């Protein structure tokens, strides 16, 4: 069995996939035997999807899995379902790591082989140095999303001890493969997962941990525009599904989306869901 699967769900982001996985492979050549790479393509018939497939095949190492049953960022579940490793890490297909980060992560998991916790690391901004990395997210609503970037001084020192956090962005997260609790299979489109999956682990008696050494860069810029559809009604529905599953009070969620989208019947979307 491999030690770690690293995988991404992708929708028309060939360049992200190429540079992310080539960077990973270049920096881990001495431990390839411990690693598995997976790309789950949610738009495999597009020009970019076909290019992603060709790259994965040419790499002779990255496993390509087309997935068209639904369009959703929650298809990251498929990374864990298809993993053949003891541990699994999901990353956005436009994330980069510092040298030796993957080695350190494997060493950490070797010391905690039966952990059921969910793991994150500090996110760096483009300048890399000279700022406080985002070590967590704060549980608050802003701009149609639950969670705003937060900072904890304990995340500034990459040699520091792991510490508990409430939630984080899902550009990168990891856990023991069999411990993955999964995103709700009814999620569609984009959104609804931050906070939800962390609460799900907490309700199961587990913890979300920030590993200060697990530092990552995320490309936010999209000069060609966002390639996947962003449908507000789908996002509201996802949050409603998650709130219902976890038994959360949805008052704050309703108020947020009503204030942002007065022309959308937010209550109907949520209440119709409750009747299904």
Residue ranges of each PLM-predicted region?
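Cell-envelope/extracellular polymer assembly enzymes that use nucleotide-activated donors
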Residues: 2-7, 23, 36, 196
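A conserved hydrophobic helix/loop-capping motif in glycosyltransferases and polysaccharide synthases
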Residues: 4-13, 20, 27, 40, ...
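Short, acidic, metal-binding catalytic loop of nucleotide-sugar glycosyltransferases
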Residues: 22-34
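A conserved acidic beta->alpha catalytic loop
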Residues: 39-52
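Glycine-rich, basic loop-to-helix element that forms the pyrophosphate-binding segment
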Residues: 67-83
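Short aromatic/hydrophobic "clamp" motif used to bind/position activated sugar donors
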Residues: 88
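Conserved donor NDP-sugar-binding/catalytic core segment of glycosyltransferases
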Residues: 100-144
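A recurrent flexible, glycine/aromatic-enriched loop bordering the glycosyltransferase active site
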Residues: 151-174
């Amino acid at each position: 069995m491999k030690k770690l699967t690293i995988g991404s769900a992708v929708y028309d982001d060939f360049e992200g996939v190429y540079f992310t996985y080539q960077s990973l492979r270049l920096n881990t050549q001495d431990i390839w035997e411990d690693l598995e790479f997976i790309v789950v393509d949610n738009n495999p018939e597009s020009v970019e999807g076909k290019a992603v497939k060709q790259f994965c095949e040419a790499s002779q190492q990255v496993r390509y899995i087309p997935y068209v049953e639904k369009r959703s960022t929650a298809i990251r579940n498929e990374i864990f379902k298809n993993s053949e490793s003891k541990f699994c890490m999901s990353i956005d297909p436009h994330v980069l790591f510092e040298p030796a980060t993957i080695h350190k992560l494997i060493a950490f998991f070797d010391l905690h082989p039966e952990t059921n916790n969910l793991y994150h690391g500090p996110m760096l901004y483009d300048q890399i140095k000279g700022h406080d990395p985002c070590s967590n997210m704060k549980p608050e609503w802003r701009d149609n999303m639950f969670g705003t970037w937060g900072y904890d001084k304990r995340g500034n020192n990459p040699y520091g001890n792991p510490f508990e956090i409430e939630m984080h962005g899902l550009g990168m997260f990891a856990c023991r493969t069999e411990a993955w609790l999964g995103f709700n299979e009814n999620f569609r489109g984009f959104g609804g997962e931050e906070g939800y999956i962390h609460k799900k682990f907490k309700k199961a008696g587990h913890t979300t941990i920030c590993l200060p050494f697990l530092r990552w860069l995320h490309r936010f810029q999209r000069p060609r525009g966002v390639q996947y559809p962003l449908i507000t009604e789908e996002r509201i529905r996802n949050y409603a599904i998650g709130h219902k599953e976890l038994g959360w009070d949805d008052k704050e969620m309703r108020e947020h989306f009503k204030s942002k989208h007065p022309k959308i019947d937010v209550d109907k979307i949520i209440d119709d869901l409750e009747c299904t």
